[in-house]
Amino acid sequence: SMRRPGSQGYLLMMSEKLLYEEKYDEAIEILKSCYKTHEEKGYSVAIPSIGLANAYAFMGNTELQKKYLAISAIADIQAATKEYISLWKLANLLFQEGDIKRAYTYIECSMQDATFCNARYRTQEISELLPVISRTYENKLKEEKTQMVALVILTSVLLIILLIALMFIFYQMKRLNVARKAVNTMNEELKHINSD
C-alpha cells in the first residue's frame, strides 16, 4: 500500500514532502533509491524520474532536470502512457533554452496524446504553451527561408561578378595577344630594315 513505510508509494510521498520542505538532497537520495528499485524490478521509472527532474529544477540544475525529464518521457512512451507531463515539461524547458525545433516536436506529440486520452486538464496546460512554441517555430522557419533566399541571391551575384571578371581577363588576354603579335611583326620588319 501507498502508506506502508518503506513501500515505493510511501517513499515517493516522502520525497515530495522533502521537496516541499526544500530538503533537496534528502529527496534526491530517496528518489534515486526508488529509481534503482523500479529499474531492478522492471517497473516504469517515469515517476521517480519526474521527481528527480523536479528536485533538480528546484536546485537550478537544468542539465540533470533535462536528463530526468527525458528518461521519464521515454518511460511513459514505452509504457504507452498517454497522459504524461514529462514530455511537455521537457518541451517547455527546451523552448526556454532556444531549442525550438525539438520543443515543437515534443509539444505537438504531447498535445496529440492528451487529446487522444481526453485529458482535459493536461490539454488545457499544453494548449497554453503550444501556440507560443508554434509561433516561434514558424518564425524560425521563415527566418531560415529568408536566410536561404539571401544566400542564393548572394551566390548568384558572386557568380555573375566572377563571370564578368573572367570575361574581362579573357578580353585583356586577347588584346595582349594582338599587341604581342604587332610587336613581333614590327621587330621582324626592323630586322629586315637593319639587314638591308
Predicted regions located by residue number:
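A "functional boundary" signal
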Residues: S1-K142
